[in-house]
Amino acid sequence: MAEITAALVKELRERTGAGMMECKKALVEANGDIELAIDNMRKSGQAKAAKKAGRVAAEGVILARIGAGFGVLVEMNCETDFVAKDAGFVGLANEVADYALANKGTSIEALQAQFEEKRAALVAKIGENMNIRRVQYLEGQVIAQYLHGAKIGVLVAGQGAEEELKKVAMHVAASKPDFVNPEDVSAEVVAKEREIQIEIAMNSGKPKEIAEKMVEGRMAKFTGEVSLTGQPFVMDPSQTVGAYLKSVNASVTNFVRLEVGEGIEKVEEDFAAEVAKITGGNA
């Protein structure tokens, strides 16, 4: 039997865009013949799936699961909102979330490998690129979850009544804090913002000494704006989230927020341009 080298697997991946495990399996079955492996992958539909791999998958779903003392969020992407509601796509996403819950701490790479065969088969069937993009675990004494549709998912860990922490999870979904408390804001973030604020003050004609004094007040406001407990509570803007938590005898130790497609640049074309491209400009 021919030796299946890492270089051979790499070449097949580059030529087909398929996953590592699929490429290795195809090469083993083809006894190391890369051209035969490609032919077999085309016949099985894996090559079709590979052709979709370069397309932007910025739609999809966020799913949440709660276990004993921990929770998990999973993001699975596809190309269109229509497919995000497809029973096959949603079913696979739920399988992934259930597996992540049952196998606490599973890495995104392990999840992708576990479900690659099913993912490729679904891509071949539906005709859209899709992928398991992110998995986030959160541990805590009490875990609350909130899903906004299937587009935003939040887990909050802390102490107190779960229903109160769920309200805070809803706030996190709406207000996107970066830190739990003002004092948690990193020195690097504070230094960068201070530099920006001093520059703004000096550009307005203030001497540097006065600008630096003005900035101290602005920095206190800034750290409150980017931290959960310093933000006005969306359900009662007259008080901060920190004040609300204190009033219900609860506290937050950490949170995780995922939003479908965040950080992915969507490629958008107008309809006329798309038609012109297809017809070679002879619409």
Swiss-Prot record:
Keywords: Cytoplasm, Elongation factor, Protein biosynthesis. Pfam families: EF_TS (PF00889). The keyword DNA-binding does not apply. Gene3D superfamilies: 1.10.286.20, DNA helicase RuvA subunit, C-terminal domain (1.10.8.10), Elongation factor Ts, dimerisation domain (3.30.479.20). GO terms for cellular component: cytoplasm. Residues 80-83 are annotated as: Involved in Mg(2+) ion dislocation from EF-Tu. One of its GO terms (molecular function) is translation elongation factor activity. Signal peptide: none annotated. SUPFAM superfamilies: Elongation factor Ts (EF-Ts), dimerisation domain (SSF54713), UBA-like (SSF46934). It is found in: Cytoplasm. InterPro entries: EF-Ts_dimer_sf, Transl_elong_EFTs/EF1B, Transl_elong_EFTs/EF1B_dimer, Transl_elong_Ts_CS, UBA-like_sf. Its main location: cytoplasm. Belongs to the EF-Ts family. Associates with the EF-Tu.GDP complex and induces the exchange of GDP to GTP. It remains bound to the aminoacyl-tRNA.EF-Tu.GTP complex up to the GTP hydrolysis stage on the ribosome. This is Elongation factor Ts.
